C-alpha cells in the first residue's frame, strides 16, 4: 500500500542514483502552473456544489427538501461518469499514438471551457428543470481535469519527488474551496431580496472562472515537452 505501481521499476530493481530536479524548477514549470490553474477552476465548481447546490434548489428554485435530496445526487452521478469516461478516453488516445499533450492536456482542459459556457447560460433559461440540468452538466464536466493532472505531473517529475509535487499541487488548487463559497455567499447577501438573482450572478462568476482556468490549461499543459526541457538541462533527472 502506498508504494509506486508496477510501471515504476527503478525502486524495485534497486536503482538509487536518481538525480533530483530543484523544486523551484518543478513548481514554476508551465505544466505545473497549468495543472494548478485548471484544477483551481474545477474545484471552484466542486466546492459550490458541496456548499450551495442544495440551498439553491430549495431557496432559489423552491423545491422541497425531499426533492432536493435526490436532485442533489445528480451532479455526483454525472461527475463520476465524466471521470470514468475521461480516464478511458485518455488511455485509448495514447494507445492510438496521440501525445500526452492532446490525450491529457487538451482532454482535461477543454471540458472546463465547455462547462463554463454552459454555466453562463443558466440565467437565460426560465425552467427550473433546465437550470438544474445546465448546472449539473456544466459543473460535472470539470471532473475531467482531476483524472489527467496527476499523471501529467508524473511525466516530468523524478520518482522520489512526485509525492511532494502532487501534494503541493493539491494544497494550491484546493484554495478555491475557501474562496468560492465565500464569493457566492457575498454575492447572494448583496442581492438582498432578489435571492435567485444572487445565485445567478454567482454561477456566472463560476462559469467565468472555469473558462479562464480551461484556457490557461490549454495554453500551459505541455507535459511531453516539459520532460524534454528538463532532460535537456545540465543536471539531468532520471524518469520512470
PLM features: residue spans?
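Juxtamembrane intracellular "pre-TM" segments in multi-pass secondary transporters
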Residues: 4-36, 60-63, 235-240
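Interfacial helix-cap and linker-helix signal at transmembrane-aqueous boundaries
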Residues: 57-58, 89-90, 94, 185-194
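C-terminal transmembrane helical hairpin of 12-TM major facilitator-type secondary transporters
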Residues: 101-149
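Cytoplasmic loop-to-transmembrane helix junctions
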Residues: 67, 103, 161-168, 198
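Multi-pass alpha-helical transporter architecture, strongest
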Residues: 118-123, 205-236, 240
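A membrane-interface helix-boundary motif in multi-pass transporters
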Residues: 64, 103-106, 186-210
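Extracytoplasmic gate region of multi-pass secondary transporters
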Residues: 29-86, 146, 150, 177-185
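A late C-terminal transmembrane helix in Major Facilitator Superfamily
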Residues: 83, 156-192
Amino acid at each position: 500500500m502506498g508504494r509506486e505501481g508496477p510501471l515504476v521499476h527503478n525502486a524495485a530493481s534497486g536503482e538509487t542514483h536518481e538525480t533530483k530536479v530543484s523544486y523551484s524548477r518543478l513548481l514554476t514549470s508551465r505544466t505545473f502552473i497549468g495543472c494548478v490553474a485548471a484544477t483551481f477552476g474545477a474545484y471552484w465548481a466542486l466546492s459550490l456544489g458541496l456548499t450551495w447546490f442544495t440551498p439553491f434548489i430549495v431557496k432559489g428554485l423552491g423545491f422541497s427538501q425531499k426533492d432536493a435530496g435526490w436532485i442533489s445526487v445528480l451532479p455526483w452521478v454525472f461527475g463520476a461518469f465524466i471521470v470514468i469516461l475521461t480516464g478511458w478516453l485518455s488511455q485509448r488516445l495514447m494507445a492510438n499514438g496521440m501525445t500526452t499533450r492532446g490525450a491529457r492536456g487538451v482532454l482535461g482542459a477543454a471540458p472546463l471551457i465547455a462547462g463554463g459556457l454552459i454555466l453562463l447560460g443558466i440565467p437565460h433559461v426560465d425552467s427550473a428543470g433546465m437550470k438544474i440540468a445546465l448546472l449539473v452538466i456544466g459543473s460535472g464536466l470539470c471532473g475531467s481535469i482531476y483524472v489527467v493532472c496527476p499523471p501529467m505531473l508524473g511525466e516530468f517529475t523524478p520518482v522520489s519527488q512526485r509525492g511532494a509535487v502532487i501534494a503541493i499541487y493539491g494544497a494550491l488548487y484546493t484554495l478555491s474551496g475557501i474562496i468560492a463559497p465565500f464569493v457566492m455567499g457575498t454575492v447572494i447577501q448583496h442581492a438582498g431580496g432578489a435571492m435567485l438573482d444572487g445565485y445567478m450572478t454567482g454561477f456566472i462568476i463560476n462559469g467565468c472562472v472555469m473558462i479562464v482556468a480551461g484556457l490557461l490549461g490549454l495554453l500551459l499543459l505541455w507535459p511531453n515537452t516539459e520532460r524534454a526541457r528538463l532532460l535537456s538541462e545540465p543536471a539531468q533527472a532520471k524518469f520512470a
